[in-house]
């Protein structure tokens, strides 16, 4: 019996948090996110379930355990998180982060109303550099995972695929790759050739550059049909030059460097942060 969709709020959440209000945020294949308020705090509750294989999509067993893995990662990073199981998978609860994603924040720029906020770009680079300096890689950088808070700082969310610390075997799984729009060529190539790969700080920087590109322009950095199978998408990322970077000035040149096909030619996240710190 497959779980209903959206995944309901598991009983364990009520025991752990005592909710006073609940709102559905997203419901995707393998994951439902709830905005849960308590008398004192606000939490994001993620409920995972395995994704069965279909003619259009490969199966995704790890989606069921991803919330538990993310909670362990957050705990290793000394961030509050709790997790538990439900009949079809696992769930976690973590602090809610208020604010738009980078893509949402830069929407006025894409319509020509104003230039992108390089303060926000700097905040994203700073958050990634701090993660890298702690010995971790994110593995799933994309605009929706870059939240710009009311104070202008950025938070990296969705850390289920992060690597850098001891995750128990009971909640661990091999790195499956990320949203292909933001995979680096070496990640896509390795997944196509061997089926396995490990994310790196350089692949994170590439993904951040691709996130800057699409958030500033509205275009993916590599061109392929929206409905292309994942293998076709990955082949395009691995073999096709990215679209010309039309973002003007030093920021555009920085994005170009971040999207270098050679990992060693990309700036580090700390170097990206330093460049953006000196922009007007």
Regions found by a protein language model. Name each.
Residues 260-271:
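A conserved short helix/loop substructure at the end of the activation segment
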């Amino acid at each position: 019996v497959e779980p209903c969709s959206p995944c309901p709020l598991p009983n364990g959440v009520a025991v752990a948090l005592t909710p006073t209000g609940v709102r559905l945020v997203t419901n995707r294949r393998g994951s439902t996110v709830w905005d849960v308020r308590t008398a004192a705090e606000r939490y994001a509750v993620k409920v995972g379930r395995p994704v069965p294989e279909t003619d259009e999509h490969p199966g995704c067993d790890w989606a069921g355990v991803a919330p538990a893995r993310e909670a362990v990662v957050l705990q290793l990073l000394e961030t509050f998180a709790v997790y538990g199981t439900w009949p079809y998978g696992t769930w976690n609860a973590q602090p809610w982060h208020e604010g738009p994603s980078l893509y949402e924040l830069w929407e006025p720029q894409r319509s020509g109303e104003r230039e992108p906020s390089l303060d926000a770009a700097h905040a994203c680079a700073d958050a990634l550099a701090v993660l890298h300096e702690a010995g971790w890689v994110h593995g799933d950088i994309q605009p929706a995972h870059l939240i710009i808070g009311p104070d202008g700082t950025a938070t990296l969310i969705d850390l289920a695929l992060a690597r850098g610390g001891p995750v128990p075997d009971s909640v661990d799984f091999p790195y499956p790759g990320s949203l292909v729009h933001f995979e680096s060529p070496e990640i896509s190539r390795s997944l196509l050739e061997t089926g396995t790969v490990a994310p790196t700080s350089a692949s994170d920087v590439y993904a951040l550059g691709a996130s800057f590109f699409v958030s500033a322009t509205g275009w993916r950095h590599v061109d392929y049909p929206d409905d292309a199978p994942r293998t076709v998408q990955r082949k395009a990322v691995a073999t096709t030059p990215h679209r010309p970077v039309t973002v003007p000035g030093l920021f555009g040149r920085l994005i170009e460097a971040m999207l270098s096909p050679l990992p060693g030619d990309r700036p580090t996240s700390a170097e990206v942060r330093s460049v953006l710190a000196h922009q007007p």
